A protein has these predicted regions:
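Non-catalytic terminal extensions of PLP-dependent enzymes
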Residues: 71, 90, 100-101, 107-190
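Active-site C-terminal subdomain of aminotransferase-like
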Residues: 1-102, 106-111, 184-187
Length: 190
């Protein structure tokens, strides 16, 4: 299993981990060249002689957080996601897609969801646009577990929906780009 460590591992961007069930699989990870002109070359990664500072920082972040820290953080994130999900469920102009655990995708049948995304962005929220169906998603992280965040999101989501309703044909922001890209019948032709 592989995982990037910057969101939930609390490490800097640029690191990932590859987890093996046991040593028998991990041994295939190594690159070994016995014929290299510089001598025997062994590397545990594709990157070869890449500096180890990011790996060391990742290791330090994971050791500092510890198993119990990760368990506690996971619990807080899942609780925050429940609160944010309730906010989305309570907003009549948007609807959740699927039955999400912590990555909350939602769409709208009444307003341009990408305009909602743009307005939320102006209010400091980092959501990503999705297509087919037109939707946006919020990836719940530990930052969303702070007190009052769900209430602030409820306030900002309601204001963003109203702004999208009031300016349905605005040409600024990401809404026009997402709308146009989502309308291509053959996406690979772009």
């Amino acid at each position: 299993m592989s995982a990037d460590t910057h969101k939930y591992g609390y490490a800097a961007k640029g690191t990932s981990v590859l987890l093996y069930r046991g040593e028998s699989l991990r041994r295939y990870q190594w690159f070994i060249n016995t014929e290299w002109t510089g001598g025997l070359y062994l590397s545990p990664t594709f990157a070869g002689s890449r500096p180890g500072a990011l790996s060391a920082a990742c290791w330090a972040a994971m050791v500092a957080t510890g198993e119990q820290g990760y368990l506690d953080n996971t619990k807080r994130i899942l609780e925050a996601a429940k609160e944010l999900r309730a906010v989305i469920d309570a907003q009549p102009d948007v609807r959740l897609l699927g039955d999400p655990l912590w990555v909350l995708a939602f769409a709208s049948d009444t307003v341009d969801i990408y305009r909602v995304m743009d307005e939320l962005h102006h209010r400091g929220w980092a959501l990503n646009g999705l297509q087919k169906p037109a939707s946006i998603h919020l990836c719940t992280t530990l930052r969303h577990a702070q007190p009052g965040i769900a209430d602030k999101f409820a306030e900002d989501l309601a204001a963003a929906v109203e702004k999208a309703r009031a300016t349905p044909t605005s040409s600024d922001g990401m809404a026009p780009m997402y709308g146009m890209a989502g309308s291509f019948p053959v996406r690979g032709a772009v």
